Swiss-Prot record:
Gene: nhaA
Name of the protein described by the UniProt record: Na(+)/H(+) antiporter NhaA
Bilayer topology annotation: Multi-pass membrane protein
Transmembrane segments: 23-43, 58-78, 96-116, 126-146, 155-175, 178-198, 201-221, 265-285, 298-318, 334-354, 367-387
Stretches the record annotates as Peptidase S49: 388-736
Organism of derivation: Brucella melitensis biotype 1 (strain ATCC 23456 / CCUG 17765 / NCTC 10094 / 16M)
Pfam families: Na_H_antiport_1, Peptidase_S49
Family: In the N-terminal section; belongs to the NhaA Na(+)/H(+) (TC 2.A.33) antiporter family. In the C-terminal section; belongs to the peptidase S49 family.
Catalysed reaction equations from the record: Na(+)(in) + 2 H(+)(out) = Na(+)(out) + 2 H(+)(in)
Length: 736
């Protein structure tokens, strides 16, 4: 069957596009632009909600950043190994110039960022963000120049970007690793050893390597090391038989896998990452975000640090004779490529997500990355488009006094950077004015046209999820599923589950308890503080109806305590209560027989009259417990307590008065407080007791392990009725 030229033309156009060098960068740009548009459209909420839709144990955003990006790093590892063994990096002379330039491009941006953020340890964690180069974006921009850019420059940029990626992988593995699980890490090492043995035994089928790579990813993901490192490790174990002079040889497993992954990664994996992480909302932004040291550190690190670091290191290497300048490329063109190295979209955002757990810091990171990358792309492209190839074969920077082009290039650098400074200042002022105009005119959603002229104001980060634990009920042992109570045995498991969420910056605890057993109260308090220290998380406590006596003791575990104005808070005292039946047995004709081997063994027997010495002994115990309670309050509320003589008398107050006395930190509700702290997109995740295979709740909040059996309920019915009466009495003290 014959096809007309018209029917074949669309297919050939698409094929030419997919095969072009610029295709990957253009696709990534389009994905990022689409994310900006969607995030500022009526579909914005659907976009953000979809990213946090849970699929199995992880949200969609985590699947993209932890699993899908492992495939990207697998391809990066394959490219690094191929280039080192059978490509541009196979010989030391070829490695010198891009290697030295890459080192300068990693070190100087990190120094600029550290200088601006040295006094803030939390922000300093992002020192590596401006050190990365996005190979797809940078090569995409360079490819738009066509024949204006000599092939030697493209090889130089590609090689430099690969070494830059290698540095980023090492940085992620060393500096952005969470707490280590040695069993999983050991299993990962064993799996890597299996891959190594297969390589040494000349196993050439890909399937065993791919299966082992998936297993390796699982172990690395659970070990605490970032899961994307598994992709690089697996890539380095896949065999490549060097074939000098035949870089396109497709006989080795590495070549086959690299060829199979190239287009899916370029046109599926990386664009999905860009679309998922480049969503920007322009609503409710302050102009001061652009002036924050975190944003400026990344912006200046990418735009200035990269170009000065890469070009300065390359110039020094060429001047000292360690390397040669790319053939046919002028100094201006080499400087233009150095500017393009400041495009750090994919890898910079990825490191930023690892560096900062909070929504605000991730937002500032993305603003800095986009601004620095955009400036680098525009300025680098314009400079390369205006430059002429091989303008200075005589090395103008080497012989500045002999070549007029050297003087012209020096003047150009001065004018270019002065213009860059003026442009940056002007853009900042324009953005501040635009932000003020948007707030006055409420045109936050009428921005698609401005995207072409203004640097975006906000990248919407993956929303923060805060685990929520409900501690509701009286504090005593022996609770059941029908009558839940609080004790260490019933709360330990659910607390550990909440604090184990490694992505959450804090744990929220809802308390509604009138108190109860002081020992159980202190044990729960201690467990919360120990878990917070172990996992380095903040604890926010929110009081509902009441946090009194032992309930307030548990609330002291919070770094901040928030209550409703009508909540009941306080009752810092100790009470003991029981029933006395000294005349009951006589009336019903029952004789009670008690045998002891100690004179004080029947202290406070409810069937005997009270003794003065027994009451004094009980009050002495109460004073000791009360003193411990007071010490806890003074320690946890140091510098916040008011001067009130009734503070430790056992009185209780409303939330409003408790705030003025320093017993709590503020008034409000959980959702409003957490939105103010972590941003509007914060998500609350209620931690539920674990369920068995048949869906029945396992022992958790308020129940003992055997509390669900009807026979046990019947057997302990008498005790249960007394406990219910005691519990009702505790609640009744506060009118509840």
């Amino acid at each position: 069957m014959n096809h007309s030229p018209q029917s074949a033309r669309p297919v050939s156009i698409m094929r030419r596009f997919l095969d072009s060098e610029a295709a990957g960068g253009i696709t990534l740009m389009a994905a990022a632009a689409l994310a900006l548009i969607v995030a500022n459209s009526p579909f914005a909420q659907t976009y953000f909600d979809a990213l946090h839709l849970y699929i199995g144990p992880l949200s969609l955003a985590h699947w993209i950043n932890d699993a899908l990006m492992a495939i990207f790093f697998l391809l990066v590892g394959l490219e690094i190994k191929r280039e080192m063994l059978d490509g541009q990096l196979a010989s030391w002379p070829n490695r010198m110039l891009p290697g030295i330039a890459a080192a300068g491009g990693v070190i100087l941006p990190a120094i600029i960022f550290a200088v601006l953020n040295h006094d803030n340890p939390a922000k300093l964690r992002g020192w590596a963000v401006p050190s990365a180069t996005d190979i797809a974006f940078a090569l995409g921009v360079l490819s738009l120049l066509g024949s204006r850019a000599p092939s030697s420059l493209k090889v130089f940029l590609a090689t430099l970007a690969i070494l830059d990626d290698l540095a980023a992988v090492v940085i992620i593995a060393i500096f952005y690793t969470a707490e280590i699980s040695m069993p999983y890490l050991g299993a990962a090492f064993i799996t890597a050893a299996v891959l190594f043995v297969m390589n040494r035994m000349d196993v050439v089928k890909l399937l065993p390597y791919l299966i082992s790579a998936v297993i390796l990813w699982f172990f690395v993901f659970n070990s605490g090391v970032h899961a994307t490192v598994a992709g690089v490790v697996a890539a380095l174990m896949i065999p490549l038989k060097p074939a000098p002079g035949r870089p396109d040889d497709m006989t080795s497993p590495l070549h086959k896998l690299e060829h199979a992954l190239a287009k899916p990664v370029a046109f599926i994996v990386v664009p999905i990452f860009g679309f998922a992480n480049a969503g920007i909302s322009f609503k409710g932004l302050e102009a001061s975000v652009l002036g924050d040291t975190l944003t400026l550190g990344i912006l200046l690190g990418l735009f200035l640090g990269k170009q000065f670091g890469v070009f300065g290191a390359a110039w020094l290497a060429i001047k000292t004779g360690l390397a040669e300048k790319p053939m046919g490329a002028s100094w201006v063109q080499l400087y233009g490529v150095a500017i393009l190295c400041g495009i750090g979209f994919t890898m910079s955002i990825f490191i930023g997500l690892l560096s900062f757990p909070s929504d605000l810091m991730q937002t500032e990171t993305k603003i800095g990355v986009l601004s620095g990358s955009a400036l680098s792309a525009i300025c680098g492209y314009l400079l390369l488009r205006a430059a002429r190839p091989d303008q200075s074969a005589a090395n103008p920077l080497w012989k500045a006094d002999e070549s007029p082009e050297a003087k012209n290039f020096g003047r150009f650098l001065c004018v270019f950077h002065f213009a860059s400074y003026i442009a940056s200042t002007y853009c900042t002022e324009r953005l501040q004015a635009a932000s003020s105009l948007l707030r006055r005119s409420s045109l936050e959603f009428a921005l698609p046209g401005l995207l072409k002229r203004l640097i975006p104001r906000r990248f919407r980060a993956v929303e923060t999820e805060i685990p929520v634990v409900r501690l509701h009920g009286a504090i005593m042992t022996g609770g059941t599923s029908l009558r839940p109570t609080l004790s260490l045995a019933s709360t330990a498991g659910i607390l550990e589950k909440a604090f184990a969420d490694k992505h959450a910056p804090a744990v929220a605890i809802s308390i509604n308890s009138p108190g109860g057993a002081p020992v159980q109260s202190r044990l729960i308090y201690r467990r919360i503080r120990d878990l917070a220290a172990e996992h380095q998380k903040k604890v926010f406590v929110f009081v509902e109806d009441v946090a009194a006596s032992g309930g307030y003791m548990i609330a002291l575990a919070g770094d901040e305590i928030i209550a409703d104005p009508s909540s009941i808070v306080g009752s810092i005292g100790v009470v003991s209560a029981s029933f006395g039946f000294p005349e009951l047995l006589k009336k019903i004709g029952v004789e009670r027989r008690v045998y002891t081997a100690g004179s004080n063994k029947v202290t406070l027997d409810p069937f005997q009259p009270e003794k003065a010495e027994d009451i004094e002994r009980l009050k002495a115990l109460q004073l000791e417990i009360h003193a411990t309670f007071i010490d806890m309050v003074k320690e946890r509320r140091a510098g916040k307590l008011g001067d009130n003589p009734d503070l430790f008398s056992g009185l209780f107050w409303t939330g409003t008065t408790a705030a003025s006395l320093g017993l709590i930190d503020g008034l409000g509700d959980m959702l409003s407080f957490l939105r103010k702290t972590y941003g509007d997109k914060v998500k609350l995740k209620l931690i539920q007791p674990q369920r068995g295979l048949l869906g029945r709740k396992l022992p958790g909040i308020g129940m003992d392990s055997g509390s669900v059996e009807p026979a046990q309920i019947a057997a302990h019915l008498g005790d249960g009725l007394l406990c219910v009466a005691e519990e009702k009495a505790i609640w009744a003290r506060y009118g509840l």
